[in-house]
Amino acid sequence: MAGIPDHIQDQHLVEEDQPFDLEDWLPITASRNANWYYSAFHNVTAIVGAGVLGLPYAMSELGWGPGVVVLILSWVITLYTLWQMIEMHEMFEGQRFDRYHELGQAAFGKKLGLYIIVPLQLLVEISVCIVYMVTGGKSLKNVHDLALGDGDKCTKLRIQHFILIFASSQFVLSLLKNFNSISGVSLVAAVMSVSYSTIAWVASLRKGATTGSVEYGYRKRTTSVPLAFLSALGEMAFAYAGHNVVLEIQATIPSTPENPSKRPMWKGAVVAYIIVAFCYFPVALVGFKTFGNSVEESILESLTKPTALVIVANMFVVIHLLGSYQVYAMPVFDMIESVMIRIWHFSPTRVLRFTIRWTFVAATMGIAVGLPYYSALLSFFGGFVFAPTTYFIPCIMWLILKKPKRFSLSWCMNWFCIIFGLVLMIIAPIGGLAKLIYNIQKGTLPNSRCNLPKH
């Protein structure tokens, strides 16, 4: 291994006179006893989330040709950049980059690395938590509407009420102290993600046998066809968000010179990506083939029969998002707790920890209640912040730290990913922002199977 560059030596999170080791208290590095299957289910939980349910809708906005190309290309590129980050986790002897921003400091410099990575990573993790609040609320509402059906049984409960119900569980789960303490929750969440994805495409396939003519051409929705196309690119990008927590997951795995953490981490990541492919490709392709351009923003909203199975699928989504929210919230807790103790000199107490975490849950809940627009949030955040942290920043750091030979295969692959990611970051948020503005102006709330009175 290479020596540690001068600009990243002695990067301590704790002041020299600190009477304890902060790393042993922070949620990311407090426990290092994970293994490859921890890596597998943490990555499945992190990657397979709200994005998979919106893939058929994204396909309807892109069309068969572009949709399949973007779907496959995104899977390949993000697997490659995930491998890069795993390799760079401990590329210098005696140094582990346990957090995304620490690797950014190694590549861009101590200050510039923070300025580049921290805002983007925070935006990703906060936006994921907001979208998961919305998706959890939507799924609970679907369960409610399917169970009661149309007519007099319908209540006046709106999606905002169900977001509040979903958020109440997060106040409890946020009390789990570190990454390894949420392993059980994450494992259940990973199983749930595979389960509801399977139900979604199998139920769609079953419905397809009885469906009449289906149209696959572009259809104007809330925005023009070109803007919808751009929006769909962001929705595709949102489906691959695991890079923002991959180093934090790897930090929980022990490492020795004989058995570096990258081996079990990569093994788990490969297993996770095989599972991701099993979830994403059937849902996207079968869902679009069955419903065409009439598919709803979430594939589960297009499915009504068999009612009991669709209700179960929606509950699986809720259970999965309970764990997935925590996987993305934990690095945010880690950052805030570190700053509060190291810079503002707060004592590391349970009161501090609970206050930080409950404030964060309440903030994401409030934003979700105010902006419950699933597809628009997916496309805007997917392009604006997911494209940089997932598609091209890992490649830029690889070029800086690994320095591959110019015009070599590695050099060319990285520049292709950088250009692809930059284009995605520039054009995708345009469609998402247009859709978000339209929904806010019209006051459009997600569809309901119950005919609720308008106020």
Curated annotation (Swiss-Prot):
Cellular component aspect of the GO annotation: plasma membrane
Membrane topology: Multi-pass membrane protein
Main location: membrane
Keywords: Amino-acid transport, Cell membrane, Membrane, Transmembrane, Transmembrane helix, Transport
Residue ranges that the UniProt entry lists as topological domain Extracellular: 60-61, 135-158, 203-226, 289-307, 379, 434-455
Segments passing through the bilayer: 39-59, 62-82, 114-134, 159-179, 182-202, 227-247, 268-288, 308-328, 358-378, 380-400, 413-433
The protein's name: Lysine histidine transporter-like 4
Organism: Arabidopsis thaliana (Mouse-ear cress)
